[in-house]
């Protein structure tokens, strides 16, 4: 019996895959557990539609990430932050990814999730810092952050 796997089944098939399996296994286990559906014309058309929607959504997310990358890599996109610092240019506190995200939103209207910033440790010195950003699978950029002394 041909079935369409709705979920990954170890040793049998992956989600969305159409495979031939024994009748008893398909009817008594896969279909009853909701792991697969019978591969008839209607279900195959539904599978094609779902795959097309997923691909379109993936492409839309990738295009949005590319647009944000363009904005981040523009010359004028530098996040300006102020912090109290000592005479040796070391900050009394630190600049976290949350503050960088807030600065991006306030200054440029770019909304990002703080988990997309790959800041290994908070910024603790005055000056310019490049912070890597992973926007999407295969789409990476850098945010330039300029920390100045607060009066």
Swiss-Prot record:
Q: Where does the signal sequence lie?
A: none
Q: Which GO terms describe its cellular component?
A: ribonucleoprotein complex; ribosome
Q: What does this protein do?
A: Binds to the 23S rRNA.
> Which keywords accompany this UniProt record?
Ribonucleoprotein, Ribosomal protein, RNA-binding, rRNA-binding
Q: Gene encoding this polypeptide?
A: rplI
**Database matches in NCBIfam families:** L9
SUPFAM superfamilies documented for this protein: L9 N-domain-like, Ribosomal protein L9 C-domain
* Keyword Cell membrane part of the UniProt annotation: no
Against InterPro entries, the record matches this protein to: Ribosomal_bL9 (IPR000244), Ribosomal_bL9/RNase_H1_N (IPR009027), Ribosomal_bL9_bac/chp (IPR020594), Ribosomal_bL9_C (IPR020069), Ribosomal_bL9_C_sf (IPR036791), Ribosomal_bL9_N (IPR020070), Ribosomal_bL9_N_sf (IPR036935)
- Record family assignment: Belongs to the bacterial ribosomal protein bL9 family.
* Any one biological process term the GO annotation gives: translation
What's the protein name? Large ribosomal subunit protein bL9
The superkingdom of the source organism is Bacteria
Q: Which organism is it from?
A: Lactobacillus delbrueckii subsp. bulgaricus (strain ATCC BAA-365 / Lb-18)
The GO terms describing molecular function are:
rRNA binding; structural constituent of ribosome
């Amino acid at each position: 019996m041909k079935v369409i796997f709705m979920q990954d089944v170890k040793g049998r098939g992956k989600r969305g895959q159409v495979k031939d399996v024994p009748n008893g296994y398909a009817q008594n286990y896969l279909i009853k557990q909701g792991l697969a559906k019978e591969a008839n014309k209607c279900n195959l058309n539904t599978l094609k539609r779902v795959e097309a929607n997923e691909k379109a959504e993936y492409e839309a997310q990738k295009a949005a990430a590319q647009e944000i990358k363009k904005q981040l890599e523009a010359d004028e996109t530098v996040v300006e932050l102020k912090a109290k610092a000592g005479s040796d240019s070391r900050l009394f506190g630190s600049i976290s990814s949350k503050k960088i995200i807030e600065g991006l939103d306030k200054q440029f209207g770019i909304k990002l999730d703080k988990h997309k910033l790959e800041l290994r440790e908070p910024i603790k010195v005055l000056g310019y810092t490049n912070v890597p950003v992973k926007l999407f699978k295969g789409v990476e950029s850098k945010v330039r952050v300029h920390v100045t002394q607060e009066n």
